[in-house]
């Protein structure tokens, strides 16, 4: 005790120093000061405490610090600096974010409280609150809090003992308000809003302090600060933290918690009775671990006191009437309660119902917690994991005490309206919203994981069914009843995981889950469900929390609630639970889930962006098709005058005239919307953008480098043939159309003969420019298959509809002008040498010069169509040129021969004849 007390005082000292220097000393200086003045072990303990305290805040980015908590650096100095930096950062985050974490810090002086809150955070918000109350009383609860034991009720002794000794609560505005806890603390809410919320619990609990403990299910003792850095905290330490009345946390957090408690108490006023029995059983189980807290009945309060509770229950976040308010109204609500966070009121009401029925768990405890069986708040996890007995008490033993209530209260409290039922992995699954008591009683079996599974089967089926019927099941359980197996898995894995997983894992997972923007997650789920789901499993960012668990997008319904329902029903969690059941794999699996969830969210964002493009692409394809038709009509005179039989070349490309803009539209429709739903779509889209940039560059270069002697149409034909062979891409119709036109041009060229080659080349160039899209198809000719694929499947850099507006659009106009200015359309480069040689001429043309050029005339399709460097056509062009040269030589030779013959016939023959 002496050592623990000293440690507690020491930690409090550090926190006080941080608080005093927070606004006056730089971050680096604070870190240096901590490193210089404290040992690594001390700093590590403090970091652990702060981390778990901060984890109470759903907004806390636990994932950023989770790995660091486990980081093993050989260099002690470096590790010390890292730990100090983490301490300062976490401390600042707690101060800025306030909420449950900050409220917990005020247990002693607010700083001390903060540290204590860290321990308490390990316990639970409720416990922290209790600890805060008891801590002012120097209750054993403090020890329990630090020990991270859910036995917040254990702290009831402290409550009893300390409450007697503890001074009256100070005004809530005073950071030390938590310190002075007394039976009056029932009205402590007056001084501490969150305590006020507890006051209703206090009604059931002997003292507000007890209420708080009861309200905060997690005891630091039981939970241990963290699995790695569990900081054994004896009562003295807790008392020390408690004794420190320095306001460590901003009142706003406390007020939020108070508000939450008020709302919660509105719902949980009846729950104390429920909590009482449950808490008693839990306390009994916990007593070995920590002192029994007869007032543990408020265990629901503890669960409600969850870090999320303060925010969710806070009137600010979800006033009793507003607890059901828009899920997205409050990030805190959303994060803490996941998708159902905003429904605390109903949850509370249901919690009351549950309280009325000891077997029923209050859905309030943690909506997201109930949803995320695996991701229960640290205090819940510790509550379940700190001691197997506690776990049993809370989850498995919940049945004995209506254990569902203790844990479910924590979770269901939030979930009760919607989430709790699906969220309740086991006992929670037991209809917390008035689910059958037997469902809740089944948690007794839950103590036994198999019975828990059974319970899951029943209760989850019932839960999903009944919960769906139940108001608390609102979107979650009404949507889908988990399959018995899934429910079992969810519950079993949830409880097993809770009990098996270390508090730290729970807190870390919860923190990670909570740290994500739940509103974004739900929007993503909505998008995914609307888009048809990418088929990617949403790893349970909020597995246990219920915010997000592994949801197969196929499982996702149109509404995030539906998705959550499935999650709550354990559909995603069942898989996650199965995968996570091994304790050794749970943590990494949770991290993987978190990363996958983030990836899915990112994909969802991209998809949403792409969705807006699908319509545009369709329109562009249509416009482009029309432009191609018009262009063909315009080119008909040229074709008639200059028909070259290059169709042989174009014949290579399938003349899929059927591939009309409509076909392209269809393709875009199929690929666009489908791709949007498919992760590949993002890739294809990205490749499309890349290809576009490549095309733009190629266009610029090709504009300069193409020799007039070569026929762009020939290139287009060859390219089109390749493209056609490659795939029936949305652009195939463009390619085909262009190919046909090119074929005509080639025929014209052949018919025209070498003399008309220049004109034909000029016309073909114009045509090519007009058909800038076909050049894109030509790009596939390039050696790089990837680029070709991009060209084929990616959207055109200048869709017809887009080009129609390019003239007026400064973005496209400038780009076009720049490209034109850089390149004189005279000589496309057909070889790398030519390309490199002509590249230097890009910047020669000025804007005025460009404007004077016919190709730069916006009224001319050539203005909208640019040539692309197509090295693949070198051989083709050379072959053609060779043929033309041979034809010329043959003609010349023929002429010479004819002349010679004529001379012979005209001169020689007559002479000979005359001679003869």
Curated annotation (Swiss-Prot):
Residues 1-891 are cytoplasmic. Its main location: membrane. One of its GO terms (cellular component) is plasma membrane. One of its GO terms (biological process) is negative regulation of cell population proliferation. InterPro entries: MINAR1-like, MINAR1-like_C, MINAR1_N. It comes from the Eukaryota. The keyword Transmembrane applies. It is found in: Cell membrane. Residues 390-409, 553-591, 648-675, 705-726, 745-782 are annotated as: Disordered. The keyword Transmembrane applies. Pfam families: MINAR1_C, MINAR1_N. Residues 913-916 are extracellular. Widely expressed, including in breast epithelial cells and endothelial cells (at protein level). Expression is down-regulated in advanced breast tumors (at protein level). It is a single-pass type IV membrane protein. The chain crosses the membrane at residues 892-912. Residues 553-564, 575-591, 750-771 have a biased composition (Basic and acidic residues). Keywords: Angiogenesis, Cell membrane, Membrane, Phosphoprotein, Transmembrane, Transmembrane helix. Belongs to the MINAR family. Interacts with NOTCH2; this interaction increases MINAR1 stability. Interacts (via N-terminus) with DEPTOR (via PDZ domain); this interaction may stabilize DEPTOR protein by impairing its ubiquitination. PANTHER family: MAJOR INTRINSICALLY DISORDERED NOTCH2-BINDING RECEPTOR 1, MAJOR INTRINSICALLY DISORDERED NOTCH2-BINDING RECEPTOR 1 MINAR1 FAMILY MEMBER. Intrinsically disordered protein which may negatively regulate mTOR signaling pathway by stabilizing the mTOR complex component DEPTOR. Negatively regulates angiogenesis. Negatively regulates cell growth. Negatively regulates neurite outgrowth in hippocampal neurons. This is Major intrinsically disordered Notch2-binding receptor 1. It comes from Homo sapiens (Human).
């Amino acid at each position: 005790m002496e050592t623990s007390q000293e440690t507690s005082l020491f930690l409090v000292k550090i926190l006080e120093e941080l608080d005093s220097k927070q606004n006056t000393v730089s971050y680096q200086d604070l870190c240096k000061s901590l490193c210089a003045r404290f040992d690594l072990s001390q700093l590590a303990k403090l970091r652990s405490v702060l981390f778990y305290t901060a984890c109470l805040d759903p907004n806390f980015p636990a994932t950023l610090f989770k790995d660091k908590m486990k980081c093993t650096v050989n260099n002690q100095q470096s590790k010390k600096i890292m730990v100090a930096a983490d301490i300062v950062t976490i401390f600042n985050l707690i101060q800025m974010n306030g909420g449950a974490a900050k409220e917990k810090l005020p247990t002693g002086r607010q700083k001390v409280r903060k540290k204590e809150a860290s321990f308490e955070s390990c316990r639970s918000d409720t416990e922290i609150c209790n600890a805060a109350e008891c801590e002012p009383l120097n209750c054993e609860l403090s020890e329990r809090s630090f020990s991270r034991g859910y036995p917040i009720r254990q702290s009831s002794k402290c409550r009893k003992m300390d409450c007697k000794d503890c001074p009256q609560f100070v005004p809530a505005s005073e950071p030390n308000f938590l310190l002075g806890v007394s039976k009056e603390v029932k009205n402590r809410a007056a001084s501490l809003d969150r305590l006020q919320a507890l006051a209703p619990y206090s009604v059931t609990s002997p003292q507000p302090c007890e209420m708080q403990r009861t309200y905060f299910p997690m005891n630091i003792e039981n939970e241990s600060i963290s699995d790695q850095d569990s900081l054994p905290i004896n009562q003295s330490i807790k008392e020390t933290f408690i004794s420190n009345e320095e306001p460590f946390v901003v009142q706003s957090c406390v007020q939020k918690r108070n508000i939450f408690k008020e709302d919660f108490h509105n719902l949980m006023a009846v729950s104390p009775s429920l909590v009482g029995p449950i808490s008693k059983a839990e306390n009994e189980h916990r007593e070995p671990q920590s002192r029994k807290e007869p007032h543990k009945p408020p265990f629901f309060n503890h669960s409600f006191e969850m870090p999320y509770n303060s925010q969710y229950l806070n009137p600010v976040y979800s006033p009793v009437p507003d607890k059901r308010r828009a899920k997205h109204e409050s990030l805190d609500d959303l994060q803490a309660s996941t998708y159902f966070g905003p429904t605390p009121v109903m949850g509370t009401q249901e919690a009351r119902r549950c309280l009325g029925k000891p077997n029923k768990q209050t859905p309030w405890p943690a909506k997201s917690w109930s949803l995320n069986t695996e991701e229960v708040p640290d205090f819940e996890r510790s509550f379940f994991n700190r001691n197997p007995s506690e776990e049993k008490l809370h989850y498995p033993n919940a049945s004995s005490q209506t254990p569902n209530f203790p844990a479910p209260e924590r979770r269901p409290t939030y979930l009760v309206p919607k989430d709790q039922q699906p969220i309740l992995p086991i006992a929670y699954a037991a209809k917390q919203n008035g689910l059958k008591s037997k469902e809740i009683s089944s948690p007794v079996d839950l103590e036994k994981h198999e019975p828990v599974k059974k319970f899951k089967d029943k209760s989850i089926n019932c839960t999903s069914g009944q919960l769906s019927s139940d108001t608390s099941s609102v979107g979650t359980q009404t949507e889908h009843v988990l399959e018995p197996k899934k429910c079992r898995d969810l519950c079993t894995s949830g409880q097993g995981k809770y009990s098996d997983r270390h508090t730290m894992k729970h807190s870390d997972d919860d923190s990670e889950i909570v740290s994500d923007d739940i509103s974004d997650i739900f929007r993503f789920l909505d998008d995914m469900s609307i888009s048809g789901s990418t088929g990617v499993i949403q790893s349970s960012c909020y597995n246990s929390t219920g915010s997000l668990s592994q949801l197969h997008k196929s499982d996702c319904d149109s509404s995030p609630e539906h998705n959550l329902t499935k999650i709550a029903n354990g559909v995603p969690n069942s898989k996650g639970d199965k995968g996570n059941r091994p304790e050794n794999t749970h943590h990494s699996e949770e991290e993987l889930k978190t990363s996958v969830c983030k990836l899915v969210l990112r994909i969802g964002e991209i998809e949403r962006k792409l969705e807006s493009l699908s319509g545009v692409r369709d329109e562009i394809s249509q416009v482009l098709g029309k432009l191609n038709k018009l262009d063909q009509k315009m080119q008909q005179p040229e074709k008639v005058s200059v028909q070259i039989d290059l169709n042989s070349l174009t014949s290579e490309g399938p003349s899929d005239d059927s591939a009309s803009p409509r076909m392209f539209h269809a393709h875009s429709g199929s690929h666009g919307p489908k791709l949007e739903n498919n992760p590949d779509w993002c890739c294809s889209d990205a490749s499309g953008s890349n290809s576009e940039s490549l095309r733009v560059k190629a266009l610029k270069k090709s504009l300069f480098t193409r020799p007039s002697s070569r026929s762009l149409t020939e290139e287009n034909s060859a390219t089109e043939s390749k493209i056609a062979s490659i795939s029936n891409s949305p652009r195939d119709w463009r390619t085909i159309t262009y190919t046909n036109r090119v074929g005509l041009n080639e025929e014209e060229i052949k018919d025209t003969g070498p003399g008309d080659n220049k004109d034909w080349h000029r016309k073909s160039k114009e045509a090519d420019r007009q058909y800038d899209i076909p050049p894109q198809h030509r790009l596939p000719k390039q050696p790089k298959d990837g680029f070709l694929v991009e060209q084929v499947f990616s959207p055109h850099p200048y869709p017809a509809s887009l080009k129609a507006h390019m003239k007026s659009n400064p973005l496209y106009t400038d780009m076009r002008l720049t490209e034109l200015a850089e390149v004189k359309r005279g000589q496309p480069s057909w070889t790398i040498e030519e390309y490199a040689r002509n590249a230097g001429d890009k910047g020669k043309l000025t804007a005025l010069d460009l404007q004077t050029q016919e190709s730069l005339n916006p009224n001319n399709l050539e203005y909208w169509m640019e040539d692309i460097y197509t090295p693949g056509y070198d051989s083709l062009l050379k072959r053609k040129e060779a043929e033309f040269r041979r034809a010329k030589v043959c003609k010349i030779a023929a002429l010479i021969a004819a002349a010679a013959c004529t001379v012979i016939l005209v001169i020689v023959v007559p002479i000979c004849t005359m001679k003869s």
